[in-house]
Amino acid sequence: MKILFVAAEGAPFSKTGGLGDVIGALPKSLVKAGHEVAVILPYYDMVEAKFGNQIEDVLHFEVSVGWRRQYCGIKKTVLNGVTFYFIDNQYYFFRGHVYGDFDDGERFAFFQLAAIEAMERIDFIPDLLHVHDYHTAMIPFLLKEKYRWIQAYEDIETVLTIHNLEFQGQFSEGMLGDLFGVGLERYADGTLRWNNCLNWMKAGILYANRVSTVSPSYAHEIMTSQFGCNLDQILKMESGKVSGIVNGIDADLYNPQTDALLDYHFNQEDLSGKAKNKAKLQERVGLPVRXXXPLVGIVSRLTRQKGFDVVVESLHHILQEDVQIVLLGTGDPAFEGAFSWFAQIYPDKLSTNITFDVKLAQEIYAACDLFLMPSRFEPCGLSQMMAMRYGTLPLVHEVGGLRDTVRAFNPIEGSGTGFSFDNLSPYWLNWTFQTALDLYRNHPDIWRNLQKQAMESDFSWDTACKSYLDLYHSLVN
């Protein structure tokens, strides 16, 4: 099967979050499974700076963006058997960052038009075209409405993956003519209109042949008013083509037996290296080295979406216990300030690190006993899977991908891979935390068994790849 991915970011070239991880990993797994895979990404200035000497020029042409003719260069490299093509336009993509400009609508309108028009020119007409989030969600619409006259594109099947429904690409209807060069008919009849705006995500949901999300629970949640971001009724209407597939993690990169960022290696049969990493981490972040004290890790953006309003409200109660916490992250200044204040009050129990440090993050995943992740909503989440890979048991709010990946501790069977609570409140966070502490202190054999189950969980991309192939084969025989 010929499969083409079009996305706004993709590791290792450009990455701001989980979308970049998916684009960096899933195509590689599909190639391993025997398929011909290509990816189209914007050619950002950070790509030029880091990878420019590995990328070759292929061709260039002009793209009509409304009444304007814009330069489009095509560049190319091959990595892990995947051919990466880059759309080059320095005006749109040399901004020092991926998102956040006032003209993001124009930038990604150009990108989508250029990606479609590039397919013929690079001689890669896919059987299946996989687009991601609102930045590329207009492509299925454009293929069926603007480019339907191109015979080579007639049989292309499309999949839209929603990584985060909050970001929908809502713009003025004038964009249809001014940038995409199409009429207002589909806006006037309500197809593309939502809340009196042009809504790119709605267009993708309606025009893509299949819609996927990054976990089965999130696929269900976005059809509810609580998580549907005002598109729940549209998603309910299209529910027959909506499904969820849990993202994977790189099992080679996140491997406690070989991880180059760790001082000591270990496996599920011998955790002595984990204990040594714990002592090393405690020393590094300025906490007393205490082997018996439960060490809780947090690696996150400090935002309300991640549940930190509830964490801050619970923190004084938690720190009354014989426990240590190491936090790594940045975000809302109010939460940063709160954690910094608590670290001054409890210097032997809380280490607050308001920064981003890849090595420290990896050490937290590997060395801690418990990993706190009480997100208010979480489409998939990767940190909980990384933590489990290293035998660090997650404590999570049962939502989205957290519900799908963490098996809650069952005290009757002594089974599970972590701890979870359903109602996001200080009471239930504290109650679940107490359950975990009791198990850690008084039932070490059961705790050890949970660690082993967590480390044996399969979150590899090879597993996720099989689910995506089932989805693709439902469209392409």
UniProtKB/Swiss-Prot annotation:
EC primary class: transferase
Molecular function terms from GO: alpha-1,4-glucan glucosyltransferase (ADP-glucose donor) activity; alpha-1,4-glucan glucosyltransferase (UDP-glucose donor) activity
InterPro entries with a match to the protein in the record: Glyco_trans_1, GS/SS, Starch_synth_cat_dom
EC code: 2.4.1.21
Catalyzed reactions per annotation: [(1->4)-alpha-D-glucosyl](n) + ADP-alpha-D-glucose = [(1->4)-alpha-D-glucosyl](n+1) + ADP + H(+)
Gene Ontology annotations of biological process type: glycogen biosynthetic process
Pfam entry (one): Glyco_transf_5
Pathway annotation from the record: Glycan biosynthesis; glycogen biosynthesis
Family membership: Belongs to the glycosyltransferase 1 family. Bacterial/plant glycogen synthase subfamily.
Function: Synthesizes alpha-1,4-glucan chains using ADP-glucose.
Name this protein carries in UniProt: Glycogen synthase
Natural source organism: Streptococcus pneumoniae serotype 19F (strain G54)
